[in-house]
């Protein structure tokens, strides 16, 4: 929060009246954490890894909004914060987070895993061959991400293969967000740019 304390509150946003309100959840919710990799599968939100102050965590939690219930799952294979988590079909793909505490020499893992909605066991996927992946999304049956040098990467879960694609323009290589809308991937709004660019994967062969 604005005092520097790690917050354990949860809020819901209403698109109808542009407002935030606190969610009353059960007492089994996790302790406050940040830089957690998050995704949604079916009717549950998944929170993977993160930090509590100087502590890196490997916890995996789910939150079910319809029942206001938190559930703790099996731990993630490593302690990390940041990283990515996306859903393709009936699998969650996660990893590639930061595994040390020191700034500015942050160390990113190249390891990548997947699990099903029960999150009982994590299966190893192909390691990422590039430099730190800043963000990623699921598009079609692939994972698309942008690395620290502005290159777009595509991961094919079926073949377990990473392939390097185009490099973003120099002015757009500082990436804050990445999302899909109307069959385009939008990338940008980093600390060096206030613009978004659109990327069409069908152009980039």
Predicted regions and their residues:
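Kelch-like beta-propeller repeat domains
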Residues: 1-205
């Amino acid at each position: 929060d604005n005092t520097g304390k790690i917050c354990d509150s949860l809020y819901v946003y209403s698109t109808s009246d542009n407002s935030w309100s606190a969610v009353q959840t059960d007492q089994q919710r996790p302790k406050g954490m940040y830089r957690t990799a998050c995704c949604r599968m079916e009717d549950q939100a998944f929170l993977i890894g993160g930090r509590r102050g100087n502590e890196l965590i490997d916890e995996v939690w789910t939150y079910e909004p319809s029942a206001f219930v938190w559930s703790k799952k099996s731990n993630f294979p490593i302690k990390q914060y940041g990283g990515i988590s996306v859903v393709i079909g009936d699998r969650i793909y996660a990893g590639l987070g930061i595994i040390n505490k020191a700034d500015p020499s942050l160390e990113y893992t190249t390891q990548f895993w997947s699990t099903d909605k029960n999150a009982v066991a994590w299966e190893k996927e192909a390691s990422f061959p590039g430099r730190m992946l800043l963000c990623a999304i699921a598009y079609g049956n692939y994972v698309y991400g942008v690395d620290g040098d502005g290159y777009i990467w595509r991961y094919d879960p079926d073949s377990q293969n990473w392939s390097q694609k185009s490099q973003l323009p120099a002015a757009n290589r500082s990436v804050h967000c990445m999302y899909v809308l109307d069959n385009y991937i939008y990338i940008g709004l980093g600390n060096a740019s206030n613009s978004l660019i659109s990327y069409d994967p069908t152009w980039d062969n």
